């Protein structure tokens, strides 16, 4: 059952983040952060199945080197609270093979980011979810300044507009659905909220690994409890009116299994 997920965030110094460390982690590589003279080594991290820096037309070739790229980004920002990069993270349908997922992620990054003038640092991760199934997703770190043969220029304010995020959300759904149709895969995703789709279920929160570790350690994790509450309440809604689940799942695929129904409720 294909699941829609696309999240956009800014990586900045105000939150104590480093563009170099962020890029090293997402690419499972070892990089030196020249600004603070520290090596960021995440080379033991597993699950990175594809990694590349994609340059727009006119960008100097040396910026295809990830370490050089993000050190140059750090050097171009002087403010203590500087915004360094934008990250777009999205889930790739499990119905696709690894190669198909990588191709889809590359095509999306090229059309929506690189062709618009951004440098895209793309990393595709293949993890195993809690249910033991493959969990294919991508992280794209994006530059925030214009770039030409001389290097970085001013920041492009249009890329910060809320409308851009809404466009990327919609365009990701379109890219995915077009590719699923081309591959003759019976699944679809929808970027709209459940309410906008006319589905009477509450959106499910996402529990990340930190929240799971906190619970194991006996520390209260509000997001984990909220996740379980929503799952219970959605399950109650489905029991009271099974057509709610039928409406939701048939918008994504024409056939489904008991497991698909369980995933919807959970």
What does each model-identified segment do?
Residues 1-266:
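N-terminal nicking endonuclease/strand-transfer module with a His-rich metal-binding environment
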């Amino acid at each position: 059952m294909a699941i829609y997920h696309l999240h956009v965030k800014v990586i900045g110094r105000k939150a104590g983040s480093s563009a170099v460390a962020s890029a090293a982690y997402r690419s499972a590589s070892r990089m030196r952060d020249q600004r603070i003279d520290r090596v960021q080594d995440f080379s033991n991290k597993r699950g990175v199945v594809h990694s590349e820096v994609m340059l727009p037309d006119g960008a100097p070739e040396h910026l295809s080197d990830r370490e050089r790229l993000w050190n140059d980004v750090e050097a171009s920002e002087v403010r203590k609270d500087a915004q360094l990069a934008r990250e777009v993270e999205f889930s790739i349908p499990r119905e696709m093979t690894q190669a198909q997922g990588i191709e889809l992620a590359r095509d999306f990054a090229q059309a929506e980011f690189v062709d618009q003038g951004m440098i895209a640092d793309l990393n595709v991760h293949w993890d195993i979810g809690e249910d033991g199934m493959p969990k294919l997703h991508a992280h794209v770190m994006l530059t925030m300044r214009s770039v030409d043969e001389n290097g970085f220029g001013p920041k492009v304010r249009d890329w910060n507009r809320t409308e851009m995020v809404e466009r990327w959300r919609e365009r990701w759904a379109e890219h995915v659905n077009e590719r699923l149709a081309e591959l003759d895969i019976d699944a679809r995703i929808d970027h709209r909220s459940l309410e906008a789709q006319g589905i009477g279920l509450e959106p499910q929160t996402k529990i990340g690994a930190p929240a799971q570790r906190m619970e194991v350690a006996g520390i209260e994790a509000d997001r984990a409890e909220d996740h379980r509450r929503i799952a219970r309440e959605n399950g109650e809604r489905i029991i009271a009116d099974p057509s709610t689940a039928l409406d939701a799942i048939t918008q994504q695929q024409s056939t489904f299994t008991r497991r698909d129904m369980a995933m919807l409720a959970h």
